[in-house]
Amino acid sequence: MIEEGAVADKAQAWVYTEDFIPLSNALLQAHQTASELGVPRVSTGTGTALRMLAAVSGARAVLEIGTGTGVSGLWLLDGMAAGGVLTTIDCESELLPHARRAFRGAGVPSHRTRLIAGWALDVLPRMATGGYDMIVLDGDIA
């Protein structure tokens, strides 16, 4: 049986960990845009995990399904190898300009990102087999 205090402590610990990691201005803006548009985004804890996974794997080519406003993409790009390319797919084409703005705001050169509008199940068959070091599923595929 879990004590009531333990649940409250866990909630407080989660808030602390989310607030502990400072966010760049670009990430703050992408978070704000996601909130304004009602678009889901990864938490700061999940973002740091994505950054770490991209870094330790030495990822140079990452495929992300679910672009949103660019929050997870910013974390991935921060962890990727220098010059690495993020290809990101989203079925909501109206979100892609927001992500593009977030990447530009973070100083990411445009040749390091490839944004594709469409359903992942339609787009994936056209992607290069074995062309990615890491694939992140963070959105709808169909």
Feature locations, PLM:
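N-terminal auxiliary segments of SAM/dcSAM-dependent transferases
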Residues: M1-P22
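S-adenosylmethionine/decaboxylated-SAM
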Residues: E36, P40, T44-A142
